[in-house]
């Protein structure tokens, strides 16, 4: 199975606060949003946005956005149904944000694409760095990976697909 290795860095933090993770390559941006929300410990929302600055492209759940949310110099497109490989194979990074909430934005570097026939198709946090006073991420990496395995493993993925996509 193929995966993308992503380094997700919270914007505006010094020293940087980040998580390196693997996400399955055979998914669309709507499912990737759900995975990133879980990795970043956000509540599930439909108001996510992927911004590819170099392409002047923003991917969203267009049904959940207001008219003002799609104005400006960017092209806006539907995240659901658009495969992540289409952009993650060619771009170096993107910004992930949840709109309408006071939550941090994340620069997401696309580090590499890997193949691992042994690994199940679930997202996984590989490494993280956070500051001592950071109270935004409450779960440690091992606990978070256990939650991700339960939610996105073979038994949990049907529930996710039924609810989110």
Give a label for each model feature.
Residues 1-165:
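Short linear regulatory motifs enriched in tryptophan with gly/pro/ser
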């Amino acid at each position: 199975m193929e995966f993308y290795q992503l380094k997700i860095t919270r914007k505006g933090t010094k020293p940087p606060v980040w998580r390196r993770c693997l996400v399955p390559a055979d998914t669309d941006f709507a499912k990737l949003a759900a995975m990133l929300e879980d990795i970043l410990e956000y509540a599930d929302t439909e108001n996510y946005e992927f911004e590819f600055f170099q392409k002047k492209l923003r991917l969203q759940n267009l049904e959940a956005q207001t008219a003002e949310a799609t104005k400006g110099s960017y092209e806006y497109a539907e995240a659901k149904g658009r495969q992540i490989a289409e952009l993650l194979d060619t771009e170096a990074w993107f910004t992930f944000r949840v709109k309408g909430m006071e939550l941090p934005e994340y620069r997401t570097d696309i580090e590499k694409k890997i193949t691992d026939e042994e690994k199940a198709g679930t997202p996984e946090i590989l490494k993280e760095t956070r500051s001592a006073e950071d109270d935004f991420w409450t779960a440690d990496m091992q606990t978070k990976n256990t939650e991700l395995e339960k939610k996105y493993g073979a038994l949990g993925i049907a529930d996710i697909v039924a609810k989110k996509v």
